[in-house]
Design a protein with these regions (language model features):
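Alpha-helical transmembrane segments of multi-pass integral membrane proteins
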Residues: 353-459
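Hydrophobic alpha-helical transmembrane segments in multi-pass membrane proteins
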Residues: 59-64, 233-402, 467-514
């Protein structure tokens, strides 16, 4: 008598469920910090999952997964609280060792990273955990180097790891917990020897840029260590728009190449198989250490070791279980890495490969050459499909030709990367071998040329506002069904995939409907990083934006969240100097005009003096001269007067006293649109102009007759 067995709807993998519950626990805890009402859906998820396990009588598994779920909450709380410890010390002495030096783009300004930081207040010393971000102003030479011990008087504050409902992932990634600023003339520098790894990186950087040039040398350095500070904006944009920016970051692709080479040679040696495994473990751990335990490198290393270990134990390797184990290990130690784009892309690419390649493997190709070609093309397609939602949601674009260019570029890169690693080792031993760098130079030049050509093609990339959460979930569900991890057969499976993808496309379409400004009045908004005006013609102007690197990144994120692709102008009133390259790149990306006074501190870097309109980095720049702009300076603030679409505007910068208000009435004797974006602004006449307090004002008339 045959036993009646019922096929499971989903191919059950405990590690996958555990990884998913850990992820949900971390995400819910982060959301709860921003909105306490998120406790409700977090509880609903726990109850629904518990009921499911009770029905299936999986009591032990329920206990394990609920423990992991709550563990996700716990480790997230500990992480956030570690960064939330209040620290604001006036006039303290900070002493720290420089671990990183980056030129900010402002003249004489550098961003440093301090480690082993000690602060001293009234002879009481306190050691700080983590690292500290330090901005140094007025640097007159390049005397600051990695390894130096720097001390100086400052005010130090802690970094909020969750800010504006989002995770400051860049700070978290580098374990930066505090920030401060120092004046170069008030610091003392004690030269110190850098570590072996720091010497290795510095020497490699110098060798590559010297023998391969700034462009190729910078790319090669990024490929080796994941540090993209030497790559200029144009190169970065070209690689991004062509769809090969992933090769610039040390990732699983790089680990895979090195692992394959080492594994091949170890198999040729007459060594015990466990000694070979130990050699692989030591090599991969060392590589992770050099790459500062980048999540993508750690993920790839864990999966490589799992693959070898299962073979040693005579077991069958399961890709989904392997990637889930890697996810669990990384998130247990660094839970907020879930919000790191590199982490997401690394797992997305592998997930795509696992799910899509299962479909390709069903075709039994007899011709070995054809099979290898199909395999290579399939991997490129699968990885691009796997990371498609992540790229759309994180970067706001889709590279149209990414699959095709990766088919061409990856084989070239597969030759370039191992050669670069090997030749770089020889050059580190002796510069006599530097001539060998001509080979990787030629290969990378070829990749750059291909990237430039593809990015210049029509419709090379499509700007989007992202796919959104619902469409992303539906997209990956369709991938799981296609990969055979959901047991549906024949037409039902096909219809399920089509229906799921159609729903995903529908939500993507809804998510990408641009924002329309339909007010007949003016919208004035004040934000930590900018103030803005929407005119009655639906023009959008941003005023005195935060020009720091963090400010620009945050502003891009805010505009993306508001579904704004184009703005009409950046208006600068305050005379603060800023990085001309950062602002120019921003203006180019958002197709906007820059307005600033002729005597603005940054005007010489942006403009050709004497012309009203000039070209700079493909971005149109305008500046006001004194014929079209007047400024009125008062005790505490300044007012700038200018025209937008033949309408006269006054924009204030500063908080005015009552005495100032009386002077403003005497100076301005005609109807204007008055915009103030400072807190506690005063009334002009008998009307309250604007009290920002970080609120959004819709349809608020700003016409004030004075």
């Amino acid at each position: 008598m045959m036993e009646n067995t019922k096929e499971r709807f989903i191919n059950f993998r405990p590690l996958v469920i555990i990884a998913l519950m850990l992820c949900i626990g971390v995400v819910f805890m982060v959301e709860i910090y921003s909105n306490i009402l998120m406790v409700i859906p977090a509880g609903v998820v726990a109850v629904v999952f518990a009921l499911f396990c009770f029905i299936k009588k999986k009591y032990i598994f329920l206990a394990i997964t609920m423990f992991i779920y709550l563990l996700g909450f716990g480790i997230t709380v500990l992480t956030i609280e570690t960064y939330s410890k209040s620290l604001s010390k006036e006039d303290c002495l900070i002493i720290g060792r420089v671990s990183d030096v980056v030129y900010s783009g402002y003249e004489g300004q550098y961003y440093l990273t301090f480690e082993n930081v000690v602060i001293e207040v009234e002879d009481a010393k306190t050691s700080l955990s983590g690292k500290t971000s330090v901005t140094v102003y007025g640097v007159v030479n390049d005397d600051i180097t990695v390894g130096d011990i720097i001390s100086g008087k400052t005010k130090i504050s802690n970094i909020n790891i969750i800010e504006d409902n989002s995770v400051n992932i860049n700070y978290y990634h580098d374990d930066i917990r505090y920030y401060c600023s120092l004046s170069f003339k008030n610091i003392s520098i004690e030269n110190n020897n850098p570590s072996v790894i720091e010497k290795l990186k510095t020497t490699t950087k110098d060798n590559l840029t010297k023998h391969m040039g700034e462009e190729v040398g910078g790319i090669s350095y990024a490929v080796l260590f994941g540090d993209k500070s030497l790559i200029d904006y144009q190169t970065s944009t070209t690689f991004r728009e062509s769809g090969i920016s992933h090769i610039l970051a040390v990732s699983g692709l790089h680990v895979g190449f090195l692992f394959a080479i080492l594994y091949f040679f170890l198999n040729k040696l007459p060594l015990n198989r466990w000694l070979k495994f130990l050699a692989l473990f030591i090599f991969l751990f060392g590589f992770c250490f050099v790459c500062e335990f980048s999540p993508s490198v750690v993920r790839a290393s864990i999966m490589c070791l799992c693959l070898v270990l299962t073979r040693l134990l005579g077991k069958q390797y399961d890709g989904l279980s392997g990637i889930s184990l890697a996810f669990i290990i990384i998130v247990l130690f660094r839970p907020l890495f879930i919000y790191d784009v590199g982490f997401q892309m690394s797992f997305g690419a592998v997930l795509g490969s696992i799910l899509i390649l299962k479909v390709i493997d069903r075709f039994d190709l007899k011709n070995k050459t054809l099979k290898n070609i199909v395999s290579g093309v399939s991997i490129s397609i699968a990885t691009q499909i796997g990371i498609l939602p992540i790229i759309a949601n994180s970067f706001g674009y889709l590279a149209t030709y990414s699959v095709l260019i990766n088919i061409v570029v990856i084989p070239i890169f597969a030759i370039f990367y191992p050669l670069l690693c090997i030749i770089n080792l020889f050059v580190l031993i002796s510069n006599v071998f530097s001539f060998l760098l001509v080979v990787p130079f030629a290969l990378m030049k070829t990749i750059v040329a291909i990237s430039s050509f593809v990015s210049s093609l029509p419709y090379a990339y499509i700007e989007v506002f992202g796919m959104g959460l619902i469409s992303t979930i539906l997209f990956y569900i369709a991938m799981f069904v296609l990969g055979g991890f959901v047991n549906l057969k024949g037409d039902i499976k096909t219809l399920s995939i089509i229906a799921t993808l159609c729903l995903s496309v529908m939500f993507v379409t809804i998510n990408n409907i641009p924002k329309k400004f339909t007010t007949n009045n003016f919208i004035v908004e004040n934000n930590t990083y900018y103030a803005s005006i929407n005119t009655e013609n639906n023009d959008l102007y941003l005023i005195d934006i935060d020009t720091s690197k963090k400010g620009i990144e945050k502003l891009r994120s805010i505009l993306k969240g508001k579904k704004i692709k184009q703005i009409d102008g950046l208006i600068f009133i305050s005379n603060t100097n800023f990085s001309s390259s950062e602002i120019s790149n921003f203006a180019k990306d958002f197709d906007c005009v820059i307005y600033l006074p002729q005597n603005h501190a940054s005007a010489p870097n942006l403009l050709l003096m004497g012309n009203d309109v000039v070209e700079y980095d493909d971005s149109k720049m305008l500046y006001f001269n004194f014929g079209t702009m007047q400024t009125f300076t008062y005790q505490k603030g300044l007012i700038a007067e200018f025209n937008i679409n033949n309408k006269k505007f006054l924009i204030s910068s500063g908080v005015f006293s009552e005495e100032d208000v009386l002077k403003i009435k005497n100076d301005i004797l005609y109807p204007v649109h008055f915009v103030s974006y400072d807190e506690n602004s005063y009334s002009l006449g008998d009307k309250q102009i604007f009290n920002s307090n970080y609120h959004l004002y819709y349809g608020e008339k700003c016409d004030i007759v004075i």
